[in-house]
Amino acid sequence: MPRDPRAWLWDIQQAAKRVSRFLDGHDLPSYQSSDLVRSAVERQFEIIGEALSQLAKHSPELAAAVPRWREIIGFRNMLIHGYATIDDTRVWRIAQIDLPPMAQAVDQLLGVP
């Protein structure tokens, strides 16, 4: 039985909320100095990227409504395959700049006010 595409949107929504929660109270230097927070945030971006990848395969019109979805999938691939060269500043920037509008779009797709 095929998965309901909204399930991938829900996965994205929940992972985005976790990123925001994990980063609450941190600035870039404190983020960079915490292995635990960095690992947690990176894992959530892996989930977001994989969910977007599956959404793009099974419901491309929904994926297209998520800002920068292709870039986030590429970012997920970099986290998975380029783990030895992750740029903490890039992760931080994506979390601070790119994630909020993406999360807002996903909320709208899910009908969350």
Residue spans for each PLM region:
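Solvent-exposed interaction patches of small proteins and small membrane subunits
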Residues: 1-113
